[in-house]
């Protein structure tokens, strides 16, 4: 599938009559509240946006005319929430200190936007599965140590479970109900505990960023989950950052190390390969 993680945000806002012609820059001022949540649920059965429907149509064509395995794509709930809130970091930190949504409007905004995100993402992945997707690539790059304090988590805070895992579980259950596998991608910087938590979702494939050492992460991930990655594609834009020879050496080492630990593995990039406009010329 084409990687466009702005589709869900645009569709969500359109269903609520918000965002205008620049949905990518729209941010809620305060918590959307129960009225917005109810409005979204009432309108979820409306047709998907044209780009979302086009992806579903492509999946159906693959199912009906090829022997390829159709795979869909969507953004993760936490990552979508961070695109809807002006400052998600402070409320999450306050929640990590023990405050609740009833005590802080910022936490309420994060909580409400997560609920909106789960609703529209669940609708989208179910539509993709109905169109023929056998698996969904769910991209959750914002679930990382920038947004979620490792120190707070180490001290017993449940912020990773509350804001990342619980929404992901709801999407995972929707995929299970639709008989579609989860391919989970998170290229953010993660702790061992975060990796283990993500692996507990039992994804068919877990794709991680180049900050992780995959042959060490193999001990955190069940053998039923294929590890994917994690060549540093964010540095591929310039030979001054990394050369072709260095990438080849990294790939060879990854293959050798993963064979040694015996974990199912697919060599690939940590994320999408950045494109420089005009490079095709």
Residues covered by each model-derived region:
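Alpha/beta enzyme core
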Residues: 95-108, 112-144, 154-155, 161, ...
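Active-site-proximal, glycine-rich beta->alpha crossover segments in alpha/beta enzymes
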Residues: 18-127, 155-159
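Catalytic-face loop-and-helix region of soluble metabolic enzyme cores
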Residues: 173-281
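Short beta-strand segments at enzyme active-site cores
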Residues: 1-3, 70-73, 131-140, 181-187, ...
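Short low-complexity, flexible loop/linker segments enriched in glycine and/or proline
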Residues: 14-17, 87, 151-153, 199-201, ...
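Aromatic/hydrophobic pocket-lining residues that form the small-molecule binding cavity
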Residues: 51-55, 114-121, 164, 168, ...
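Glycine-rich, proline-tolerant flexible connector loops at the mouths of alpha/beta enzymes
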Residues: 1-31, 41-48, 135-158, 269-270, ...
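Short glycine-enriched loops at secondary-structure junctions
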Residues: 4-6, 28-29, 74-89, 134, ...
């Amino acid at each position: 599938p084409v990687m466009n993680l702005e589709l869900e945000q645009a569709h969500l806002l359109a269903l609520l009559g918000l965002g205008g012609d620049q949905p990518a820059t729209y941010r809620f001022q305060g918590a959307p509240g129960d009225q917005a949540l109810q409005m979204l649920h009432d309108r979820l059965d409306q047709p998907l946006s044209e780009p979302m429907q086009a992806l579903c149509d492509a999946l159906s064509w693959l199912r009906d005319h090829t022997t390829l395995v159709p795979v869909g794509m969507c953004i993760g709930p936490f990552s979508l929430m961070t695109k809807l809130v002006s400052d998600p970091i402070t409320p999450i930190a306050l929640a990590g200190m023990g405050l609740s949504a009833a005590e802080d409007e910022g936490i309420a905004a994060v909580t409400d936007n997560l609920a909106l995100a789960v609703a529209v993402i669940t609708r989208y992945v179910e539509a993709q599965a109905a169109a023929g997707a056998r698996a969904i690539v769910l991209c959750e790059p914002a679930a990382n140590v920038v947004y979620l304090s490792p120190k707070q988590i180490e001290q017993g805070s449940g912020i990773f479970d509350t804001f990342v895992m619980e929404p992901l579980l709801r999407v995972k259950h929707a995929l299970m109900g639709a008989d579609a596998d989860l391919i989970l991608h998170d290229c953010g910087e993660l702790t061992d505990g975060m990796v283990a938590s993500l692996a507990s979702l039992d994804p068919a494939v877990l794709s991680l960023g180049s900050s992780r050492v995959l042959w060490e992460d193999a001990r955190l991930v069940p053998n039923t989950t294929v590890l994917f990655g994690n060549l540093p594609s964010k540095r591929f834009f310039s030979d001054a950052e990394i050369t072709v020879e260095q990438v080849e050496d990294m790939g060879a080492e990854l293959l050798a190390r993963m064979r040694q630990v015996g974990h199912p593995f697919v060599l690939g990039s940590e994320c999408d390969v950045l494109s420089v406009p005009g490079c095709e010329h």
